[in-house]
Amino acid sequence: MYAIIKTGGKQLKVEAGQTIYVEKLDAKEGDKVTFDKVVFVGGDKTVIGTPFVEGATVEATVEKQGRAKKVVTFKYKPKKHQHTKQGHRQPYTKVVIDAINA
């Protein structure tokens, strides 16, 4: 059985036991989180939500909070001695999918 959930402005296909990276969630390591915005549930019985499947949830455990690799941006104006270097590290949450309840 698999499901498509919506979190952090993205839609992700998940299965039980899978490890995924999502946008930062307000939870500590070891906490249980529930995703209730389930768009689609597939398997023996397929259910498509309008826009979400009623009563369907995906349970997960937070494994790690972290920050992604640094993305460096560099802008410059030729012949003007003007340049800007800036870096950004996006925070993420690593979760393990425990169960899909549909």
Curated annotation (Swiss-Prot):
Keywords: Ribonucleoprotein, Ribosomal protein, RNA-binding, rRNA-binding. Disulfide bonds: none annotated. One of its GO terms (molecular function) is structural constituent of ribosome. InterPro entries: bL21-like, bL21-like_sf, Ribosomal_bL21, Ribosomal_bL21_CS. One of its GO terms (biological process) is translation. One of its GO terms (cellular component) is ribosome. This protein binds to 23S rRNA in the presence of protein L20. Belongs to the bacterial ribosomal protein bL21 family. Part of the 50S ribosomal subunit. Contacts protein L20. This is Large ribosomal subunit protein bL21.
